[in-house]
């Protein structure tokens, strides 16, 4: 699966064009100027913290020269997959916020989307980056701080109130934490139609095995949008059963 090349639709009024989108005939990413400025500001906040940048959907792990650099081309399939996952959704719960790059992408792809993040706050830059996004997207950005293995079970009790319809699991990268996060997200979504989970880093065998475990148990069904999904993205989307 390499992404479908589709005939472009009718022109969209400028006021309705999202800050991040893709050209359906070429798969080229389209970054609006507000998006570029926000991406630049996040880079500045990370630099000011003095910490190296943890890998994300725009830049590889510990890349030093990211400030002012365009997004990494090799990661474009992963970014396009996030766009595919969130563009018709209403409320996203992401496990693992980091510097907020995935949050920025999701919020910029869908003007209706509300974002909720869970993060253990191990990086000095995370709080400032989230505060910046809150200012840029008023009323649409929320943060739960703490270990996902404690926060997510708490959210199970608020599942009806919050009604998340898409989850992004990109937190602790051990099989134990991944299995816990996936299981809890499934519990939050259980019994509700149209719920999906996006799992990152499936190029790691232990993460891929956790995903296969849930598929084999009948908890998940892989979603490809009729072959539009890009396997090169190293992330996978599933419908929660």
Residue spans of the language-model regions?
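A short alpha-helical cap/connector motif
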Residues: 1-168, 172-241
């Amino acid at each position: 699966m390499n992404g479908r090349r589709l005939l472009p639709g009718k022109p969209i009024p400028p006021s309705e064009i999202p800050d991040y989108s893709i050209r359906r005939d070429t798969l080229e990413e389209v970054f609006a100027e507000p998006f570029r400025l926000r991406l630049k500001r996040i880079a500045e906040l990370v630099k000011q913290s003095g910490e190296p940048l943890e890998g994300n959907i725009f830049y590889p792990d510990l890349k030093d020269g990211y400030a002012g650099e365009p997004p990494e081309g090799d990661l474009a399939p992963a970014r396009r997959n996030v766009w595919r996952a969130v563009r018709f959704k209403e409320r996203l719960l992401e496990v693992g916020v980091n510097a907020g790059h995935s949050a920025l992408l999701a919020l910029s792809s869908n003007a209706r989307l509300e974002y909720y993040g869970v993060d253990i706050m191990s990086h000095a830059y995370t709080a400032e980056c989230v505060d910046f996004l809150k200012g840029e997207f008023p009323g649409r950005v929320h943060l739960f701080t703490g270990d996902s293995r404690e926060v997510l079970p708490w959210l199970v009790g608020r599942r009806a109130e919050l009604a998340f319809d898409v989850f992004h699991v990109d937190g602790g990268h051990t099989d134990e934490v991944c299995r816990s996060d996936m299981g809890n997200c499934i519990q939050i979504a259980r019994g509700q139609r149209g719920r999906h989970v996006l799992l990152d880093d499936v190029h790691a065998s232990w993460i891929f095995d956790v995903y296969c475990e849930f598929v084999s148990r009948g908890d998940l069904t892989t979603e490809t949008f009729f072959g539009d999904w890009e396997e090169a993205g190293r992330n996978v989307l599933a419908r929660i059963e």
